[in-house]
Amino acid sequence: MYYRDFIITSIEAERILAMKFDEAFAGVKNNAIDTLNQMGNGITRASYYTSCLMNNYQDVCSKLKQEDTRFIAGLAQLVKNRDIIFQMIKIYIETYFQNKKEEKAQNILKKLVGAGVYLSSAVLTNRILIMAVATMICQTSRFNTVVYGRINRARSLVLKGSVTATAVVLNVYGLIQVAANSADNLKMHNSFYYNALYANHLEMMYFLIEPVITGVPYLNPMIISDDELAELLIKLMR
């Protein structure tokens, strides 16, 4: 009986050990794939710069240079002012309140409270409601998991995935390309929010919160109803 139990225990231990090795190798594999994809994006972006040598593609060249400059400007804001993540969420909510009169705040507040969202009844203006909702969104575990996960992943790909100066450049360029793609997608699907971020030099940082924003349906800020806005905010706060 003892030997049988010992054999079963040994087999189980080997199975667990094999699973741990599989997990470890899967992690290494995924990191390697992410790094290669990032460098691939960097190579793609670097190849776009050949357009600067052709007279017919100066508009492409100009767009690339502008994206690089605005990415660096956004990154500088992120380093100096960690509040920009909150600012981007606040700006997003503001776009939906731009055509809402002040008295609408209480109506929307009642709908949020009725859905189980805890907000102070002292909220009287759109501005205060926007600040309160933006704060609650930024405090949700899902939001922090997504945003900080993206920040850490970007930092890891640039630093840990780079063993040479060339790799550093390609990884940074890859990150800029990811940011540019996200900004372009936003411009195509939600021009109101894109323009608001652009005015604040933050559109190239949008990629950090993109999964949060695309996780809720897009609604036209010009015609959104109070019920639709309340439902949108509730989804973001959960």
Enumerate the language-model features and the residues they cover.
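Generic alpha-helical secondary structure signal
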Residues: 83, 87, 103-106, 119, ...
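Short, Lys/Arg-enriched charge-dense amphipathic segments
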Residues: 57, 62, 124-135, 213-224
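Terminal export/targeting leaders at protein ends
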Residues: 1-111
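C-terminal assembly and membrane-engagement modules of membrane-active proteins
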Residues: 202-238
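Membrane-engaging insertion elements
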Residues: 8, 29-68, 72, 151-217
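N-terminal amphipathic/basic membrane-interacting segments and domains
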Residues: 7-18, 192-200, 231-235
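Membrane-inserting effector segments that mediate pore formation, membrane fusion
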Residues: 113-182
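Generic secondary-structure transition motif, activating predominantly at the C-termini of alpha-helices
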Residues: 79, 93, 97, 113-116, ...
